[in-house]
Design a protein with these regions (language model features):
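Loop-rich non-cytosolic ectodomains and luminal regions
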Residues: 1-213
Length: 213
């Protein structure tokens, strides 16, 4: 993982790593969920644009939390609930949609990754079921805007915890951005705690409307 490697570099003498937070805060690519009490499940809905060739979604939770998922297409077609199995990888074909979905589980990082190939445009739903919960907190992320071929986003998104991967490393110097013309917040600049609780960015610098010679 990139953050681990950057932390290793920062631990060596005469080495400093500086990185930006990225511009994902306003992209609607982060969903923060919480399943508590008697809740049986929670839905994360993704709007998929026309002519999207494919994309992936990551679900991440902290140990010892475990979650199962099912996916519902815009037409209502639904795959069976996918239970957690170490190192499991399962592929599903939506008959009416012509869409293929691959779901991979990684227990070591409590991460689930789902790849959508030729997704039908419309509203896709990832339904999350608790298997083992302590806090009930989990997160889903879509790829960076530059890594997707369509404007796909969560219907109910959260702008927090939107740091790009390098900037979440504990020992790097992380820089956010602000509007230079009026010293106001730049809404797109990634921000908030990392998934492990570190406060980022370390400071902000002019990033928009910067005067030059």
């Amino acid at each position: 993982f990139l953050p681990s490697y950057l932390n290793y570099i920062c631990g060596r003498r005469k080495r400093v790593v500086v990185t930006a937070t990225g511009n994902e805060a306003n992209a609607r690519h982060h969903f923060q969920g919480r399943i508590i009490g008697e809740m049986e499940h929670e839905d994360a809905e993704i709007t998929v644009e026309e002519n999207t060739k494919g994309f992936f979604v990551e679900l991440l939770a902290s140990a010892p939390e475990l979650y199962a998922v099912t996916i519902i297409s815009p037409s209502g077609e639904q795959i069976p609930r996918i239970l957690v199995r170490r190192g499991a990888s399962e592929q599903f074909n939506f008959i009416f949609e012509g869409t293929t979905i691959t779901v991979d589980y990684r227990i070591d990082t409590k991460e689930t990754a789902s790849r959508f190939i030729r997704p039908t445009p419309g509203l896709w739903t990832i339904r999350i079921f608790p298997q083992l919960t302590v806090t009930g907190n989990y997160h889903l992320w879509l790829p960076l805007r530059e890594l997707t071929d369509g404007n796909n986003f969560f219907l109910r998104s959260n702008p927090e915890i939107t740091l790009t991967s390098p900037s979440a490393a504990r020992q790097v110097i992380t820089v956010g951005g602000y509007q230079a013309s009026n010293t106001s917040i730049y809404a797109d600049s990634g921000r908030d705690y990392t998934i492990t609780g570190e406060i980022k960015p370390d400071f902000v610098a002019p990033a928009v409307d910067v005067d030059g010679p």
